Amino acid sequence: MDLYVEKYQSCGDSDNQRHYHPVGTLVYILSGKGASNASGEWKTYSDGSYWFEPSMWKHGGIDTDEPKFGDDQCTETLVIRAARKGEEPTVFIK
């Protein structure tokens, strides 16, 4: 297994392509706000909180129910994920 630890910073509402991770992913909010429906319902997370995205869970893309934070909201996250040797940690769905 390979381990990926990445720090991201973004401003404005989420805008990412639909995707999944072959191995589970941990998302930790360093600062700002984020939202996830990994638990089955949308929840908002802020500084010091985290959520787990299960393996093969398809998410991202357009979801009209996703909470909106506005263009002036910036978020910094630490994302920890693993991948089997030779596999990408994120698979985008076309």
Where are these regions (language model features)?
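Structural recognition of the beta-strand scaffold that forms the well-ordered cores
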Residues: 18, 26-28, 37, 50-53, ...
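A short glycine-rich, His/Asp/Glu-containing loop-to-beta-strand
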Residues: 1-18, 80-83
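Short acidic-glycine-tyrosine-enriched beta hairpin
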Residues: 10, 33, 38-58
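Membrane-topology and secretion signals of cell-surface/extracellular proteins
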Residues: 4, 15-16, 37, 55-58, ...
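Double-stranded beta-helix
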Residues: 62-94
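Short, conserved beta-strand element in jelly-roll/cupin
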Residues: 9-11, 21-36
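Extracellular/periplasmic catalytic domains that process cell-envelope and extracellular macromolecules
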Residues: 20, 28, 43-44, 69-74
